[in-house]
Amino acid sequence: MINLTPWLNAPTWYVAFSGGLDSTVLLHLLAEYARNHASPPLRAIHIHHGLQAAADAWPAHCQAICDNFDVELQVIHVQVSPGASLEQAARDARYAAFRQVLGPGDILFTGQHRDDQAETLLFRLLRGAGLRGLAAMPGQRALGQGSLVRPLLACSRQHLQEYAQAQGLTWIEDPSNVDTQFARNYLRGEVMPHLQQRWPQASQNFARAAEHLGEALGLLDELAQEDLALAGKGAPLAWPGLDSLDLAALLALSPARQRNALQYWLSQRTRLPDTRHWAGWADLRDAGADARPVWRLADGRLVRSHGRIWWLSGDWLQQPAGSLAWPDPDGPLRLPGNGCVRLVGAAVPSGLRIAYRQGGEMLEVPGRGRRDLKRLLNEQQVPHFLRSRLPLLYHGECLLAVANLPGLVQADCQLHWQLPTNAQGLS
């Protein structure tokens, strides 16, 4: 039913095991394969969302199935954040847990099938999704340090049910799956049966259409990569790891190509905004030269500074803590929420500390005398959002050096700053 050869060299195979029909069939197929072939260790993960009382009994059911299949089970309890979409919040919590489990190269198998593919296309059409939303669920994609794989996409729900019955498998029927207040359940229970009665191949054709849309998206992604190769040039060397694009290169593109390039770039960093919220790009792009526009997105924000747009997320969304003593400057100093610093060069006196700008700082620059730090940062074209978190090296009240700016140093040393992680939390 499925081909597992591409993933035989993975360190570990995991199965997202809800206990329902799809994941039970998937776990059985993998367990049977592992019993008869050399393969990576197989483990199951059950996510307990705590959203309904019936779910409290599901871990025990899953444990019994796993014991029967001789598969190790890990049960993870998650907190689902309240919001407009309970379905989306539960999905976010679930995939965040999966990302935490997966190590480098690990594979997470999930049980989505052809009917899921069709329902997803119809659901997103009704929401007015663009090509990226309408394209087929990929058979494989990155997830955390590993990959998510959907080996059942060519199988129908009926095919899985027939297999389960033939193998004598038992599974959980989630009562929430028949609650038609949820959009996906309404499509599955009320809409798709009528469509299939009139067009028996509806699910298969929807899934095929999603594959065609995926091919078209692939071509647009190739175009985006070409455009981003140009827009990515010229990033300041002083700020490694901080993602940015050249605004002029984007402005040279048509509006449609701008949006296509940004969709591709942002899709690797955040959940994409809906059509209505794309007005934020125009506001950011067209703001006055002296403005400091911000486009807030689901998992971070875009800001504009010195002719570039910059992606900020994770620690970059919070201001770092205040002054921090550096008792051992021979080793690196970790800065809470702001990466770490180290000294390179001649020996420096004891009693050092790292602090951040308060305003009015002066630095003795060799050959130039005392200079106002604000003016020096302007000369160096330091982005405005960096200035409040730029590590400053002090000896007592004397400013000795500014991180990552070799010209701004009083002592015979350099202060190297490893920037904080620009965290990405995509599912």
Swiss-Prot record:
Gene from which the chain derives: tilS
Reaction equation(s) it catalyzes: cytidine(34) in tRNA(Ile2) + L-lysine + ATP = lysidine(34) in tRNA(Ile2) + AMP + diphosphate + H(+)
Gene Ontology annotations of biological process type: tRNA modification
Any GO molecular function: ATP binding
Annotated compartments: Cytoplasm
A Pfam family reported for this protein in Swiss-Prot or TrEMBL: TilS
Protein name: tRNA(Ile)-lysidine synthase
Notes concerning its domains: The N-terminal region contains the highly conserved SGGXDS motif, predicted to be a P-loop motif involved in ATP binding.
Binding site for ATP: 18-23
CDD domains: TilS_N
Keywords tagged on the record: ATP-binding, Cytoplasm, Ligase, Nucleotide-binding, tRNA processing
EC number: 6.3.4.19
Family according to the record: Belongs to the tRNA(Ile)-lysidine synthase family.
Function: Ligates lysine onto the cytidine present at position 34 of the AUA codon-specific tRNA(Ile) that contains the anticodon CAU, in an ATP-dependent manner. Cytidine is converted to lysidine, thus changing the amino acid specificity of the tRNA from methionine to isoleucine.
Organism: Pseudomonas putida (strain ATCC 47054 / DSM 6125 / CFBP 8728 / NCIMB 11950 / KT2440)
Cellular component aspect of the GO annotation: cytoplasm
